[in-house]
């Protein structure tokens, strides 16, 4: 019997070693998932970024997926026109074509959240309204009320969108606005590593739900809409949107949960900034700006500096990119750089070497 003991011990040792190896494998496999938390205020472009990941690194959008967006595109058109019709009254702007007052009343009576079709009377009314110089003046003053960024894109495309065989394009899907409520996760596989992107609602009422997402975050991806420097909040019409974004960024980067998470700052909507800066001057909203007017590159560098200076930790690097979330090639290029940054920072932690 005594001679068997060493063999039993050997077998026990072998089993223990195998268990240890399996535990290490499990730990390694668990760590091959990177959690990327998308944060930012409402309408900064987080949901559009997720859609781009689906197009670039996922299955994309089938014809059935595209068809499921038809009524949401219709609703976005009605929602935009509703906002402008209301603003015509509040801003005291007159329709140039008197018939458009009646068209406005007709569209106003339709609850845009229940729209599922796009009938000819509505199509004709919306086209007539959009071509009215009064509505165009109202559109030019859009910073004085709440209007979605995609309003012009859709209203310029009403004839195409109203066709019976209409199938939304990828650009139509990217630009559609549906406020994120709750938490949306989108996992995708890249080079045998799972990137789990988590999008949370940006409006104030949604932010209390973020706390559940804070564990094991590899990287914070914080989106800022560059074009919001002259806009006010949906929730409060006397608070500047960019100031709100700065306050949120300051809070996020000082959270103890994110002490070991890398921070990547996306200064988004650079295309809208380039349009807007020609007639809306940054210095009117941020008096400390001393650069030239009508120069987008100087304006965006100033905005970047404002955010980077909110970082209290001199050892923490804020990685930054200027983006246009509706431009697939731009996001493809930027995310390739982001992926490399994240992997470089996590080589040892995630057993990638």
Curated annotation (Swiss-Prot):
Q: What's in the keyword line of the UniProt record?
A: GTP-binding, Lipoprotein, Magnesium, Metal-binding, Nucleotide-binding, Palmitate, Transducer
**Which InterPro entries does this one have?**
Gprotein_alpha_Q, Gprotein_alpha_su, GproteinA_insert, P-loop_NTPase
Instruction: Write out the residues that bind Mg(2+).
Output: 47, 180
Every copy of the G-alpha domain together lies at: 32-353
Q: Which PROSITE patterns match?
A: G_ALPHA
Residues that hold GTP according to the record = 40-47, 174-180, 199-203, 268-271, 325
Matches recorded under SMART domains: G_alpha
The GO cellular component terms are: cytoplasm; heterotrimeric G-protein complex
Start and end residues of each stretch annotated as G3 motif: 195-204
Q: Where is this region: G4 motif?
A: 264-271
Region annotated G1 motif sits at 35-48
| A molecular function (GO) term | GTPase activity
Residues carrying the lipid (S-palmitoyl cysteine) are: 3-4
Stretches for region G5 motif:
323-328
Q: Which Pfam families match?
A: G-alpha
Q: How does it assemble?
A: G proteins are composed of 3 units; alpha, beta and gamma. The alpha chain contains the guanine nucleotide binding site.
So what family is this one in? Belongs to the G-alpha family. G(q) subfamily.
What name appears for this protein in its UniProt entry?
A: Guanine nucleotide-binding protein G(q) subunit alpha
Give the organism the record lists.
Answer: Lymnaea stagnalis
């Amino acid at each position: 019997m005594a001679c068997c003991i060493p063999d039993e011990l050997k077998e026990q040792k072998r089993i223990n070693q195998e268990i240890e190896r399996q535990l290490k494998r499990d730990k390694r496999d668990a760590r091959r998932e990177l959690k990327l938390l998308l944060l930012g205020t409402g309408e900064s472009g987080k949901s559009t970024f997720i859609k781009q990941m689906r197009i670039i690194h996922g299955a994309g959008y089938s014809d059935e997926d595209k068809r499921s967006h038809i009524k949401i595109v219709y609703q976005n058109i009605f929602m935009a026109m509703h906002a402008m019709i209301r603003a015509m009254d509040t801003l005291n702007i007159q329709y140039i074509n008197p018939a458009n007052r009646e068209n406005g009343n007709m569209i106003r009576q339709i609850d845009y959240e229940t729209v599922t079709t796009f009938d000819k009377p509505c199509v004709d009314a919306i086209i007539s309204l959009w071509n009215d110089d009064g509505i165009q003046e109202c559109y030019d003053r859009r910073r004085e009320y709440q209007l979605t960024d995609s309003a012009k894109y859709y209203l310029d495309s009403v004839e195409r969108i109203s066709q019976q065989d209409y199938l939304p394009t990828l650009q139509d899907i990217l630009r559609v606005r549906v406020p994120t409520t709750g938490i949306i996760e989108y996992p995708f596989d890249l080079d045998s590593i799972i990137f789990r992107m988590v999008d949370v609602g940006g409006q104030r009422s949604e932010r209390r739900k973020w706390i559940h997402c804070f564990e094991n975050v590899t990287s914070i991806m914080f989106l800022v809409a560059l074009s919001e420097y002259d806009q006010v909040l949906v929730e409060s019409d006397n608070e500047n949107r960019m100031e709100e974004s700065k306050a949120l960024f300051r809070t996020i980067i000082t959270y103890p949960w994110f002490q070991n998470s890398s921070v990547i700052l996306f200064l988004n909507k650079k295309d809208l900034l380039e349009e807007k800066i020609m007639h809306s001057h940054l210095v009117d909203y941020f008096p400390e700006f001393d650069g030239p007017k009508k120069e987008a590159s100087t304006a965006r560098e100033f905005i970047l500096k404002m955010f980077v200076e909110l970082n209290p930790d001199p050892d923490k690097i804020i990685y930054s990119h200027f983006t246009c979330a509706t431009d697939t090639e731009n996001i493809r290029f930027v995310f390739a750089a982001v992926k490399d940054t994240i992997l470089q920072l996590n080589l040892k932690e995630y057993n990638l070497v």
